[in-house]
A protein has these predicted regions:
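Bacterial N-terminal signal peptides
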Residues: 9-20
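N-terminal hydrophobic or amphipathic helices and topogenic motifs
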Residues: 23-107, 291-349
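Bilobed "Venus flytrap"/periplasmic-binding protein-like clamshell domains
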Residues: 67-90, 125, 148-216, 223-225, ...
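Periplasmic-binding protein-like
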Residues: 70-71, 145-154, 241-279, 286-309
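Short beta-strand-to-loop elements that line the ligand-binding cleft
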Residues: 96-103, 201-210, 248-251
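Acidic, polar ligand-binding/catalytic clefts
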Residues: 109-168
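Hydrophobic residues within well-ordered alpha-helices
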Residues: 112-113, 169, 218-219, 261, ...
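Ligand-binding "clamshell"
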Residues: 130-142, 236-250
């Protein structure tokens, strides 16, 4: 684990440098509109996502599609969870599917930006960075016949703790997940102050590295409180990873959209259309329905409309989904990982 933390910090640092240098390789096509997209991409139709390259020679039609899912928990868990779907995707597209485990949001975004990742599920917050900096085109999320269920930001504490409301946590140990996370970091900075608790002023967020790590840390007494995504927390309780009676919720937000599924903008349009068809004709088996809180299918979404509330949160926290914010957040994430590694390796007194 210590070695992985060190590797994560090193990788994030390298990504930070690579992002700066690669920005100079601007798209040479005549681009009428780019919006907040990186200079590698163009958005002539103003739908806020990258258009397919105008030069058809840049379209990709790989023999194997690389698929990843957001690292909200141990990546190995989701490799097994998604196996029924990746098997279906292979049969439906006629291509080999490679599941690519990622250990951080930054690693997943950089993998798509560099062309090593073709289809991916991104967490709610990092979706914006994936769109603007990696050319991701979100088209689906998990849902039911009634549409998208979404998730809530939960502020959780130990059930035997004295805390009853957010303002009780002033000066306490509060864990956030990672800098780019919506419910784990950005949304609390907007939603907590009206409830009497200001991150950075009333407490210094401790980056745990994930929603599962935050929840487990609260249960273990390492943290006094943590904002976590309700869908991740509910899956942990259902799986027995954490006992529901150990935890009490003292705050619950309005609904946010859950993780998006996106394809790389430079996939051959026929292939991108086929991938979407494969997503929408797949019905979740019982194992996936159980894992995803009753969701039984993929539901069509578009980034411009369905992520408006998330973009608003990002803007209000001073973390718009642009390169400067990404570089700052990635650097902070790398520093948090390095600090955590030092703490883990420090000799116990």
């Amino acid at each position: 684990m210590h070695r992985m933390a060190g590797l994560g910090a090193a990788v994030l640092g390298a990504m930070f440098a690579a992002l700066v240098s690669s920005a100079s390789i601007a798209q040479t096509d005549d681009c009428k509109n780019r919006g907040q997209l990186d200079t590698l991409y163009c958005d002539d139709n103003a739908d806020l996502v990258a258009d397919a390259p105008k030069d058809q020679k840049k379209w990709k039609d790989p023999s194997a599609l690389v698929f990843a899912y957001t690292p909200v928990e141990d990546p190995a868990v989701y490799a097994n969870v998604f196996k029924p779907f990746t098997d279906h995707l292979a049969q439906c597209t006629g291509k080999r599917i490679v599941y690519y485990p990622v250990n951080s949001n930054a690693a997943e975004i950089e993998a798509m930006r560099s062309g090593r990742l073709h289809v991916a599920g991104f967490s709610t917050g990092p979706t914006g960075f994936a769109v603007n900096l990696a050319g991701a085109v979100p088209f689906a999320t998990k849902g039911t016949a009634n549409g998208v269920q979404g998730y809530h930001l939960l502020a959780i504490v130990r059930s035997d703790s004295p805390y009853q409301k957010l303002s009780d946590l002033k000066g306490k140990r509060v864990a956030h997940t990672s800098p780019s996370s919506n419910s784990g970091n950005l949304a609390p900075r907007v939603l907590f102050p009206p409830e009497g608790l200001k991150p950075e002023e009333d407490y210094k967020p401790l980056m745990s590295g994930g929603h599962d790590k935050s929840a487990l840390g609260v249960a273990a007494g390492d943290y006094d409180m943590a904002p976590v995504a309700s869908d991740v927390y509910e899956r942990m309780v259902l799986r027995g990873t954490i006992k529901g009676d150990q935890i009490r919720t003292i705050y619950k937000s309005a609904v946010f959209p859950t993780s998006s599924f996106a394809y790389a903008h430079d996939l051959k349009p026929d292939l991108a259309a086929k991938i979407q068809e494969c997503f929408f004709n797949f019905k979740f088996p019982e194992s996936m329905q159980k894992e995803f809180n009753g969701d039984d299918r993929f539901v069509r979404i578009n980034y411009k409309d369905h992520w408006a509330v998330v973009r608003d949160v990002a803007e209000k926290t001073g973390t718009p989904y642009n390169k400067a914010a990404y570089e700052a957040e990635s650097k902070r994430e790398a520093e948090a990982l390095a600090k955590k590694q030092q703490q883990q390796q420090a000799p116990k007194q």
